[in-house]
């Protein structure tokens, strides 16, 4: 029995040390990586002594914002040894648990005498991460967190974090950022100058969206890259994260949302459409699916400001957070893409104050608190 206990104890300790050694290896590896990695600068400023949670669609540029912040910290005199960067999408961290987060901290402390600056990329993959994040903030660590679950924007998460973090929604590139990423400057009175490069760039942004990685892709490969991203990352993430069995129904739903960007959609109507293609689907299932898609930050919705409460909930207009995604499903996309692009800008600017109006007459966007009504038309026929 003593021999068995000795062997079991030895194995347990050995595995623990192996885990810590892996953590040390990743800490050092990531320090070297982020020091050398290029990035496309975003129009964002960080308060110097505040902790942040950056939330947005996968591949929307959250990691670039971390790299940018690391670069700025190094420029301000911080050492690369102070940076504790972890990307929880790393395959080597597939089975990581909440308790392992303390192990990472311990591994860092065995390597360096500095107080680390935590950069935790896609931490929502670790169940219970909020407790660890709050503890770090309570002990006055500087922490930057990214995640691709819209629940991280909720008041509940903010409360769990004790109000110690600034929670910021991260969108794909705006058109101005897209221009900057291509080193195109808008000069004064640019509309009267040779603006062919600007028009070409706008056409690219309009049809393929503003995901940062798309900037470096050749135009002939952009649609293929977006299709692979949607199928393998966005759609695949939905299936695995929420254990969805009716994958055909989910595919039809996303396509229908893209095809009906301009029209309000009820749960009943969507359930009927999906049921004709992918078998019987209940309204409750449609409501769940829509919530799942929103949680991945792929879509957002706005309500009719004049509707009764039940209609506000069940009869919304849905938009995609980036034009490249709906364009995968559209044959004649211009009218829908223009309204979607305007919706993105208004949602990024005004957030939950954005509505539509439908009471005998319809107005695409209504900002009641700001005294604005906005109608979007691609052509005179609209």
What kind of region is each of these model predictions?
Residues 84-114:
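Short glycine-rich substrate-engagement loop in P-loop NTPases that contacts/grips substrate
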Residues 58-59:
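Walker A (P-loop) phosphate-binding loop of P-loop NTPases
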């Amino acid at each position: 029995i003593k021999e068995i206990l000795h062997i079991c104890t030895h194995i347990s300790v050995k595995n623990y040390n192996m885990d810590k050694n892996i953590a040390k290896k990743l800490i050092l590896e990531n320090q070297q990586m982020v020091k050398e990695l290029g990035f496309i600068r975003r129009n964002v400023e960080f308060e110097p002594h505040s902790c942040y949670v950056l939330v947005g669609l996968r591949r929307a540029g959250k990691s670039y914002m971390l790299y940018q912040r690391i670069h700025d910290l190094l420029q301000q005199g911080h050492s690369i040894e102070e940076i504790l960067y972890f990307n929880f999408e790393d395959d080597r961290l597939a089975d990581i648990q909440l308790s392992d987060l303390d192990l990472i901290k311990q591994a860092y402390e065995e390597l360096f005498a500095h107080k680390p600056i935590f950069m935790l990329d896609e931490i929502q993959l670790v169940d219970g991460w909020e407790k660890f994040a709050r503890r770090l903030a309570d002990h006055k660590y500087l922490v930057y967190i990214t995640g691709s679950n819209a629940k991280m924007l909720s008041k509940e998460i903010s409360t769990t974090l004790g109000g110690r973090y600034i929670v910021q929604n991260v969108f794909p590139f705006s058109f101005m950022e897209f221009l900057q990423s291509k080193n195109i400057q808008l000069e004064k009175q640019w509309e009267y100058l040779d603006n062919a490069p600007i028009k070409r760039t706008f056409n690219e942004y309009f049809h393929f969206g503003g995901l940062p990685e798309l900037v470096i892709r050749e135009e002939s490969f952009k649609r293929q890259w977006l299709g692979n991203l949607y199928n393998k990352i966005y759609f695949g993430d939905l299936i695995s994260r929420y254990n969805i069995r009716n994958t055909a129904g989910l595919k039809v739903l996303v396509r229908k949302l893209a095809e009906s960007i301009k029209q309000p959609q009820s749960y009943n109507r969507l359930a009927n459409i999906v049921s004709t293609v992918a078998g019987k689907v209940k309204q409750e299932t449609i409501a769940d699916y829509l919530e799942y898609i929103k949680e991945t930050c792929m879509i957002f919705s706005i309500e009719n400001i004049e509707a009764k409460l039940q209609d506000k909930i069940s009869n919304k207009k849905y938009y995609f957070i980036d034009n490249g995604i709906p364009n995968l499903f559209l044959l004649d996309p211009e009218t829908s893409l223009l309204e979607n692009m305007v919706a993105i800008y208004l949602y990024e600017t005004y957030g939950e104050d954005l509505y539509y109006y439908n009471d005998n007459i319809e107005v695409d966007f209504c900002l009641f608190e700001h005294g604005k009504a906005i109608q979007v038309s691609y052509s005179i026929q609209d």
